[in-house]
């Protein structure tokens, strides 16, 4: 089984920081749980990232964007097969309109 290197873009890192900061306003323990769960699921993309579907937007799908849902957040990523890299591009609240943000 091929293993991929999972990397986070600066945008995705900031997105995750923003999620944690927002949730910390309500509960530090909830913020920590969300952070841990998002990281575990994102890092699981090192194995079989193709298990996640392509996004619904045609233009982004053509660019290779896929999504992974973690509770009420969505992790957007692309796979570089030639380099065996999963590039996490963004993490955002699932109800947001993602097409203009990616």
Regions found by a protein language model. Give the residues of each.
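Basic/aromatic recognition patch in beta-strand/loop cores that engages polyanionic ligands
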Residues: 52-81
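Basic, Lys/Arg-enriched alpha-helical interface segments
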Residues: 1-62
């Amino acid at each position: 089984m091929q293993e991929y290197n999972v990397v986070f873009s600066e945008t995705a890192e900031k997105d995750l920081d923003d999620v944690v900061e927002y949730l910390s306003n309500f509960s530090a323990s909830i913020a920590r749980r969300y952070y841990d769960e998002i990281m575990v699921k994102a890092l699981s993309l090192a194995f079989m990232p193709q298990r996640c579907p392509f996004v619904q937007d045609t233009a982004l799908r053509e660019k290779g964007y896929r999504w992974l849902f973690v509770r009420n957040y969505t992790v957007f990523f692309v796979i570089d097969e030639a380099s065996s890299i999963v590039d996490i591009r963004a993490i955002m609240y699932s109800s947001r309109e993602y097409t203009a943000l990616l």
